[in-house]
């Protein structure tokens, strides 16, 4: 691949990255990229009904597949570009990949990160030596700022998902997947700006035209879906999402041109599905995945799982950089969705034994009390009753219903409840 396919105006965008480019990139970056495993998953296969393999690209040194494209792009710079350095806009993982490999290759890196970027990614990027600027409420605003810096300082601007070098680097994941699982029926790819999707689709379809490529977007940022409907890249609204790495309002022109004719299906997943997928990966695979990385499993736990039942499916777990505070909230949210946490408000007697009676009913039902808060002052007109808010650990939704019935039978009025259906 030439250092920049943009220079070859004769190439249509749909052919601007080839399978040979990706194979060349795989050889070029091999000594600096971890060749991540793609093992079978018995628990996820049982969960989905598919024969599941997990491409663990979250095991890269900076926690995501983005290192592949970053290293490829940096290695293809000329000497003067390497000396001056590069600039990029990123919500986190592209920035981390550039910062890490820039440090290894002694190339200065500046990254503009939107203000919603996870704190753990911002801190790690700075620790790796990059010059980090927080700017803008959206990726697009951060990108415009990066363009200004590139023009002002003479830096090479490296797009996180639309440069040919980046796409070729990301496609090396598919080369490894088909080496490890040559008879895979489908690869499920988390999709934001579509650089990973484009690279995987080009590489996989060149080797196995029959393989299914399934793109998965967050419903809160479904720019590829909108672009397919329009027949060209278009802007799409972006709402806050657990899959912050997929929060892109417009897919890349090159990425779209490469991916659109090669993708077999595009699915969207909501925030509840993402939360449950993060929880399932943590419990069943002992893998801490960010929202974007869990998107592939979220899709398989829904509509895609029914369509691919019994088929050999590779889930691309593309990132593991989740902020610990976010992970804590996601676990609690996922447990509540699962019926394993239940919070209810009830009225109890404010006389000796009232609280003991409530906790005994809960214990007899086989539930565990995690937290109790009671409020005497603002519990209403009854002097000898009080409102309590109780959080309990339960087994599932049926267990919640059973506990609810026991509370009613014991004359406890459940005023409100969350975590039950």
Give each language-model segment a name:
Residues 1-421:
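PLP-dependent amino-acid enzyme catalytic core
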């Amino acid at each position: 691949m030439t250092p920049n396919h943009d220079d070859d105006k004769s190439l249509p965008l749909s052919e601007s990255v080839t399978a040979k480019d990706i194979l060349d990139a795989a050889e070029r970056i091999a000594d600096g990229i971890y060749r991540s495993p793609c093992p079978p998953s018995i628990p996820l296969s049982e969960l989905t009904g598919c024969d599941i393999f997990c491409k663990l690209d979250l095991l890269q040194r900076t926690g995501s597949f983005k290192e592949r494209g970053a290293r490829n792009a940096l290695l293809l710079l000329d000497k003067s570009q390497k000396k001056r350095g590069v600039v990029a806009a990123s919500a986190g993982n592209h920035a981390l990949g550039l910062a890490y490999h820039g440090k290894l290759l002694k190339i200065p890196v500046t990254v503009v990160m939107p203000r919603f970027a996870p704190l753990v990614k911002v801190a790690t990027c700075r620790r790796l030596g990059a010059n980090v600027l927080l700017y803008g409420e959206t990726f697009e605003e951060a990108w415009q700022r990066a363009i200004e810096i590139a023009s002002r300082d003479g830096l090479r601007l490296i797009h996180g998902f639309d440069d040919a070098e980046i796409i070729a680097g990301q496609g090396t994941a598919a080369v490894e997947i088909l080496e490890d699982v040559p008879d895979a029926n489908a690869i499920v790819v988390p999709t934001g700006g579509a650089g990973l999707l484009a690279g995987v689709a080009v590489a996989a379809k060149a080797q196995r035209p029959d393989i299914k490529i399934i793109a998965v977007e967050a419903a809160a940022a479904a720019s590829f879906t909108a672009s397919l409907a329009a027949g060209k890249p278009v802007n799409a609204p972006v709402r806050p999402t657990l899959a912050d790495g997929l929060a892109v309002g417009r897919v890349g022109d090159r990425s779209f041109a490469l991916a659109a004719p090669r993708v077999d299906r595009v699915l969207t997943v909501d925030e509840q599905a993402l939360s449950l997928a993060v929880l399932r990966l943590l419990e069943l695979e002992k893998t801490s995945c960010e929202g974007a990385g869990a998107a592939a499993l979220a899709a398989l736990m829904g509509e895609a799982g029914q369509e691919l039942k019994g088929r050999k499916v590779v889930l691309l777990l593309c990132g593991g950089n989740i902020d610990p505070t976010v992970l804590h909230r996601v676990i609690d949210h996922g447990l509540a969705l699962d019926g394993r946490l239940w919070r209810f408000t009830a009225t109890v007697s404010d006389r000796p034994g009232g609280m003991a009676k409530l906790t005994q009913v809960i214990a007899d039902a086989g539930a565990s009390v995690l937290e109790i808060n009671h409020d005497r002052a603002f519990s209403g007109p009854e002097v000898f009753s009080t409102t309590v808010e109780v959080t309990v650990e339960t087994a599932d939704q049926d267990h919640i219903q059973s506990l609810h019935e026991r509370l009613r039978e014991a004359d406890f009025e459940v005023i409100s409840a969350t975590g039950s259906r």
